[in-house]
Amino acid sequence: MQLLIDINMYEGKFPHKRYKLTSEFLNNHVPVSDSILDLGVKNPFTEVMEKQGYVVTNTNGEDLDIDTSAVINSNAEVVTAFEIFEHLLSPFTVLKDIKAKKLVASVPLKLWFASAYRSKTDERDRHYHEFETWQFDWLLEKTGWTIKARKKWTNPTKKVGFRPILRLFTPRYYIIYAERK
């Protein structure tokens, strides 16, 4: 599958594998006719979804820990959240406030051999949560969602060392398709 977007934004670090697997998962569970509210500002993956025929609206960069009005006021049939919930102090509130009946969400998994990601220059580019699968599943269950499909994958790097070897076979991303109970 060819991804038709500007990869220069990633300065040589474009997440080809993650975008390909996310796109395939979305296509398997969400018909193109369903409208989507994508949590987070417009980004290269928004463009991938639009080029596949999805009608996508993004949130506007508001702090979803404090202001969930975009979620509450949306009439979208599906909410997507690709690597969003790890940035929130309380993803519970957002998940509870979603009115849509379908959710596709992915999160980075906690790696036992690496600390949680934290940008030193961008306060919003930090992971408060890096989930274990059971934690994310429980969060979804507690907020009224039933997981219908799930998938995990690795994120190998081209670096040399012990941790890069572990990344070859340790799952890094977890994606789910869920429906409201």
Predicted regions and their residues:
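Conserved N-terminal segment of class I S-adenosyl-L-methionine
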Residues: 1-78, 92-99, 126-138, 148-181
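Active-site flanking residues adjacent to catalytic metal/cofactor-binding acidic residues
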Residues: 37, 82, 105
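Short, glycine/acidic-enriched loop or turn micro-motifs at the edges of active sites
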Residues: 41, 86, 109
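A short beta-strand submotif of the Rossmann-like class I SAM-dependent methyltransferase core
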Residues: 78-84
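Flexible loop residues that form catalytic
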Residues: 84, 108, 153-155
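Short N-terminal helix/helix-N-cap motif within the alpha/beta-hydrolase-1
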Residues: 89-93, 115
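Catalytic toxin/effector domains delivered as secreted proteins or via bacterial secretion systems
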Residues: 102
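Short, glycine-/aromatic-enriched active-site segment of Class I SAM-dependent methyltransferases
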Residues: 105-129
